[in-house]
Amino acid sequence: MRTISAQQITDTVARLCIEANTRLPRDVQEALDKARAEEPWPLAKNTLDLLWSNLAAAKEENLPICQDTGMACVFVELGTDVHIDGSFEAAIHEGVRRGYTCLLYTSRCV
């Protein structure tokens, strides 16, 4: 049997909330880079450049990519031979709360 502390779950969920709001998946970033390189219209290219600058700033400063960070929905796959040391649900809620409030994210849904 494997034991996981509720604190580990909280820390992981908080980290993932921050990552999800400050970084794009690689394939999306590559698509944006490709669109910037291939865009012939100057106004559209400027818009793509602004998006890219915003993404770079978000990553460097650990800020949300967008001011509306949405509402977290956590999906968990948990094996049958795992014991959680503490409250599983409370650990997830606390991780989301920390992830969204430690960097002054919107608190509408926290």
Regions found by a protein language model. Give the residues of each.
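Charge-biased, low-complexity intrinsically disordered regions
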Residues: 1-60, 76-91, 96-101
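Conserved phosphate/anionic-ligand binding catalytic regions in large, soluble enzymes, centered on
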Residues: 61-76
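Hydrophobic transmembrane alpha-helix bundles
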Residues: 66-67, 100-104
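Conserved small/polar residues in nucleotide/adenosyl-binding loops
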Residues: 105-110
